[in-house]
């Protein structure tokens, strides 16, 4: 039997899965989800909260330190640093796609502390 390695399969219909599918466009992807797109996902339960170092007083190093401290000893520091360094760019990508983040009267993102 021949194996076809040209298929891209994304499991999950939350923000990460759908964003990945959009970033891979125009490639075709197979999206596996247990519910309708966007419903019943961790993204929905998180009320669109995203942890990213986008504040004036935030930094990659402080965000990474916080992540490692609350990670229960299972954080891969290299992967966490890669994700955190790219976080602001991914937030900007989401904004350009029309994700309705909460903003203040100056159209600046409203930031909150994430639980941990």
Residues covered by each model-derived region:
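A short, basic/flexible loop-to-alpha-helix module at the beginning of a structural domain
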Residues: 1-5
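Conserved N-terminal/central alpha/beta ligand/cofactor-binding core
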Residues: 34-116
């Amino acid at each position: 039997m021949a194996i076809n390695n040209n298929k891209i399969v994304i499991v999950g219909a939350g923000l990460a899965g759908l964003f990945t599918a959009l970033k891979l466009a125009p490639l075709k992807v197979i999206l596996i989800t247990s519910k309708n797109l966007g419903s019943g996902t961790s993204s929905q339960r998180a009320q669109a909260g995203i942890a990213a170092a986008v504040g004036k007083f935030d930094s990659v190093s402080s965000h990474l330190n916080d992540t490692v401290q609350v990670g229960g000893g299972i954080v891969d520091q290299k992967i966490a640093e890669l994700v955190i360094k790219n976080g602001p760019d991914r937030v900007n990508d989401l904004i350009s796609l029309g994700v309705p983040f909460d903003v203040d009267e100056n159209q600046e993102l409203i930031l909150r502390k994430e639980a941990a």
